[in-house]
């Protein structure tokens, strides 16, 4: 269904968590080896030959997954240590109550809470919501990215060591090709923009 309907508009819909066709939902299948990245790459190219930007954006995400694996291969400490070592000296907060509220989807921030509850119920969360929830943990609650990384590892059905580690370092600002550490996702504005319902 995604190849027929969602792929052509992937570049427009991939950041909209409320749309069923906005993502391929292939990440668990990739993680468990039911399908390979090469198969996904070639099938997406063949399934929608004339969709242009949708296929290009989708294949770009497949490449990001492979880039994370490449990064982990060359930096095996990725799950434990930031690539930008200065981040090891950040004075992270140890707040078990705030961390538990985040894990349970009880922060009071609708987009974060909906995503975290979805994660607990389904073992999956939309990528945009993963970024918002991750940014909230590290940049609003000031809780160490490793704690979020460990929670996602324990709860995601598509938990991939390379992607999980690289993504947490990206959202924190301490990884390779990261967003700037000073960029903070405003979870309220993100919710209004990407999932107003």
Outline where the language-model segments fall.
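Long hydrophobic alpha-helical segments that form multi-pass transmembrane helix bundles
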Residues: 1-7
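C-terminal catalytic domain of photolyase/cryptochrome flavoproteins
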Residues: 8-197
């Amino acid at each position: 269904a995604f190849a027929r309907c969602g792929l052509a508009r992937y570049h427009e819909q991939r950041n909209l968590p409320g749309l069923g066709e906005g993502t391929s939902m292939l990440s668990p299948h990739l993680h468990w080896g039911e399908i390979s990245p090469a198969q996904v790459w070639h099938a997406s190219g063949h399934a929608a030959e004339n969709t242009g930007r949708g296929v290009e954006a989708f294949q770009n995400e497949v490449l990001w997954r492979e880039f994370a694996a490449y990064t982990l291969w060359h930096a095996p400490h990725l799950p434990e240590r930031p690539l930008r070592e200065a981040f090891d000296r950040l004075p992270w907060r140890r707040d078990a109550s705030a961390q538990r509220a985040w894990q349970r989807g009880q922060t009071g921030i609708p987009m974060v809470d909906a995503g975290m509850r979805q994660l607990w119920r389904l073992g999956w969360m939309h990528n945009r919501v993963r970024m918002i929830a991750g940014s909230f943990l590290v940049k609003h609650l000031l809780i160490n990215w490793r704690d979020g990384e460990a929670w996602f590892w324990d709860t995601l059905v598509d938990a991939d060591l390379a992607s999980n580690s690289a993504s947490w370092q990206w959202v924190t600002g301490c990884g390779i090709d990261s967003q700037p550490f000073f960029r903070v996702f405003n979870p309220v504005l993100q919710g209004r923009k990407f999932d107003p319902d």
